[in-house]
Amino acid sequence: MFGYVTIYHKGLEKPELDRYQAYYCGLCRTLGKKYGLPGQLTLSYDLAFIAILHSALYEPETQFSAGRCAPHPVKARPRAANEFLDYAADMTIALAYYNFLDNWQDDHSRASLHQAQKLEPYLPAIRARWPRQTAAITAQLEALNALEKAGSHDLDALCRAFGDLLGAVFAFREDIWSPTLQAMGRGLGGFIYLMDAYDDLPKDARKGQFNALQELHDTLPPTEFEDRCHDLLTQQMGLCAQQFELLPILKETPEGKLLYNTIYSGVWSKYAPIRKHREGKQK
């Protein structure tokens, strides 16, 4: 379900792209140090975004360096290391573990079960470090699964379940900023859930699997359906952006530029080609 929260490359210059690479490679390196290759295979843009957000907000001591790795052995790449990349690595493993379990339950994918089993030994320590977040992840996934198994097309309830999950992950600690971070995560989580449904609609229809947007697709003409989906996605990102603007993050810092770029442009990077492809097929 993750992979939609990325940057819009054309809207950034080299210093910002290098800083993004530092956080992304830093997260990969942190996953490798803490969880080995199985951890690195769970790397996602979405959790790199959360690490950048927390770093911009809380301004921790961050070590920037450069180095080579197995996938990139020739040219040294920038790297970052701080406490929020450690946190993002833990949340990456927790979310990936439950996602693999969900895939196993839905599709009986042995590959997903195998991946979940590789990550399972790390879960007790992650739960001990982050009890509030991991409890919210399990509770909201249970709520979401119950809605989906019941065939619910209550988009508000479905988005709320995944939004509350991501909101808990956004709130690193309980402080003055946690309500704003939770609300921001709630909006972004709703967007991710709907974007995943929009992306997977043809595949889910072929397999006869639940899709939150199927009812809308079946009842609206194609053009109206596309416009309605765009409105729903815009609404969720509007909630996210509204809360983001309340945070004391300087727009002109490298991290600030990355966050503004992602929220206002990057998250739409996958939507646009999907819609263009579908509208082309309808002609």
List where the protein language model places each region:
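Acidic catalytic motifs of isoprenoid enzymes
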Residues: 1-183, 190, 194-234, 238, ...
